[in-house]
């Protein structure tokens, strides 16, 4: 596995985490070394590249092979301490020299095919993103000089199987992995890359013609939408903990309606104005419940019981026992109010709705009738 030429760790919660490199860097290095091997007609076992972020990587070459005017080489993906579905797999490049003066880039076995608009690549093309396309072509051009041409094929024998553990199918990328990476470096625990992947799904939904979107924290929300609302899950996008970011992205893309659907354990934080719901950012679930129960006239005994709870589920049991289940409609309206306050400077803010459900998939509350919301989503 390749050695990184940079060794400054990323510190997260007091722990030093090792950086890695992207599939784009692997493909670039594999293409460069394959081109060099064709020209020099001898095997090369180590290659260096400069990533788009300016970091130099010195990577070990695996499975080098030369046959006439064609060479094949592979680089093993190393995500550092940010292990994902592609970690440890081999990314191959096959380079064939010709006299055309042009460099053509294609995707072979295990590289996904683009089947939907919205990710900035032509339909039917290989899922090799713009930055890796540029770095691959530049590396090969540097190796072969200005006059020669080359056919470059990127492939990954494990790609189709590995892709089943990624978001690719939801993004309309079928049959394999994507060759990605804007910096060439994988930063462990990087929220920005995670947020960008979620936003990309929003972009694809909008490009397909959808104008109304349902944002959910995770898979449970999608199941609720399908089973209890009877709405096509094509409209569902995961927001994870990045509530504010995904709402702003939905506004940027021009969605006219945003429906927040989730368990109170996540969504009640929004009622307190918390738009990043990870517990390391903020909690305040019990405080929020206590405050709104008090506004509804709940007795001190219930407020004390809820305040002493460690989980939302435990608090919900007390709320039900005291007959204050109507708090969930109240909280849903408060959530929508907070969202509209966040978007108060938006020229044409979208309609905002909120639906709260229990772990056993029952509707707890909403800002307006769920049937009404579902009907609009089906328009």
From Swiss-Prot:
One GO MF term: cobalt-precorrin-5B C1-methyltransferase activity
Organism domain of life: Bacteria
Record carries keyword Methyltransferase: yes
Reaction(s) catalysed (UniProt annotation): Co-precorrin-5B + S-adenosyl-L-methionine = Co-precorrin-6A + S-adenosyl-L-homocysteine
Pathway(s) served: Cofactor biosynthesis; adenosylcobalamin biosynthesis; cob(II)yrinate a,c-diamide from sirohydrochlorin (anaerobic route): step 6/10
E.C. number(s) listed in UniProt: 2.1.1.195
A GO biological process held by the record: methylation
Coiled coil region boundaries: none
Matches recorded under InterPro entries: CbiD, CbiD_sf
Assigned keywords, A-Z: Cobalamin biosynthesis, Methyltransferase, S-adenosyl-L-methionine, Transferase
Entry-linked PANTHER family: COBALT-PRECORRIN-5B C(1)-METHYLTRANSFERASE
Family: Belongs to the CbiD family.
Protein's name according to its UniProt entry: Cobalt-precorrin-5B C(1)-methyltransferase
Lineage summary: Bacteria, Pseudomonadati, Pseudomonadota, Gammaproteobacteria, Enterobacterales
């Amino acid at each position: 596995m390749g050695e990184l030429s940079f060794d400054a760790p990323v510190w997260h919660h007091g722990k030093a985490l090792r950086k890695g490199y992207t599939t784009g860097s692997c493909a670039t290095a594999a293409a460069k070394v394959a081109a060099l091997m064709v020209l020099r007609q001898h095997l090369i076992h180590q290659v260096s590249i400069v990533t788009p972020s300016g970091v130099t990587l010195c990577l070990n070459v695996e499975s080098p092979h030369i046959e006439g005017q064609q060479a094949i080489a592979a680089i093993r993906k190393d995500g550092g301490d940010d292990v994902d579905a592609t970690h440890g797999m081999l990314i191959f490049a096959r380079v064939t020299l010709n006299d055309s003066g042009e460099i053509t880039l294609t995707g072979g076995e295990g590289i996904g095919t683009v089947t939907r608009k919205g990710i900035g690549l032509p339909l039917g093309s290989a899922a090799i993103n713009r930055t890796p396309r540029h770095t691959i072509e530049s590396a090969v051009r540097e190796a072969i000089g200005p006059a020669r041409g080359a056919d470059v094929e990127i492939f990954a024998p494990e790609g189709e199987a590995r892709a089943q553990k990624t978001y690719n199918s939801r993004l309309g990328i079928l049959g394999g992995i994507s060759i990605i990476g804007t910096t060439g470096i994988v930063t462990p625990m990087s929220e920005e890359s995670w947020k960008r992947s979620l936003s990309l799904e929003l972009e694809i939904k909008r490009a397909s013609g959808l104008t109304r979107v349902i944002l959910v924290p995770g898979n449970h929300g999608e199941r609720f939408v399908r089973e209890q609302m009877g709405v096509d899950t094509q409209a569902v996008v995961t927001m994870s903990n990045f509530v504010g970011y995904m709402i702003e992205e939905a506004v940027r893309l021009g969605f006219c309606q945003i429906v927040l659907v989730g368990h109170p354990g996540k969504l009640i934080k929004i009622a307190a104005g918390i738009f990043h719901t990870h517990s390391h950012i903020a909690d305040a679930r019990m405080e929020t419940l206590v405050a709104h129960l008090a506004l509804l006239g709940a007795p001190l005994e219930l407020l004390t019981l809820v305040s002493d709870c460690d989980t939302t589920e435990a608090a919900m049991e007390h709320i039900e026992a005291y007959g204050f289940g109507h708090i969930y409609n109240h909280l849903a309206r408060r959530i929508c109010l907070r969202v509209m306050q966040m978007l108060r400077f938006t020229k044409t803010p979208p309609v905002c709705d909120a639906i709260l459900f229990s772990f056993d998939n029952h509707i707890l509350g909403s800002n307006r009738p769920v049937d009404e919301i579902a009907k609009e989503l089906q328009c």
